[in-house]
């Protein structure tokens, strides 16, 4: 009989990242389901500005998994990754003739869930 051991999930959350959710989703869609080591390589080689905060978040989640739960980083993969819209920071830019122009700076919240690859073991009956 084959018994599947229950995987452990490690969750990391970054809030109020100063970029639009659409730009962060472009990167997150590329790494969803990849292994931890493959994810780091993808994020280092992609030319987008959103890669750096996502790289830091994935690295932090793996460090939490190894330190707090004692998991090996080589066994981790990204089981869930999502980007939600955050608050919109509103500023006013002065314009000519005493007018002002609104500047809207979007933010986003990024959630990364790392899981351990399931191990299959043979159980004696």
Curated annotation (Swiss-Prot):
One of its GO terms (biological process) is translation. Keywords: Chloroplast, Plastid, Ribonucleoprotein, Ribosomal protein, RNA-binding, rRNA-binding. The keyword Ribosomal protein applies. One of its GO terms (cellular component) is large ribosomal subunit. Coiled coil: none annotated. CDD domains: Ribosomal_L22. SUPFAM superfamilies: Ribosomal protein L22. GO terms for molecular function: rRNA binding; structural constituent of ribosome. It holds the Pfam family Ribosomal_L22. The keyword Ribosomal protein applies. InterPro entries: Ribosomal_uL22, Ribosomal_uL22_bac/chlpt-type, Ribosomal_uL22_bac/org-type, Ribosomal_uL22_sf. It is found in: Plastid, Chloroplast. This protein binds specifically to 23S rRNA. The globular domain of the protein is located near the polypeptide exit tunnel on the outside of the subunit, while an extended beta-hairpin is found that lines the wall of the exit tunnel in the center of the 70S ribosome. Belongs to the universal ribosomal protein uL22 family. Part of the 50S ribosomal subunit. This is Large ribosomal subunit protein uL22c. It comes from Nuphar advena.
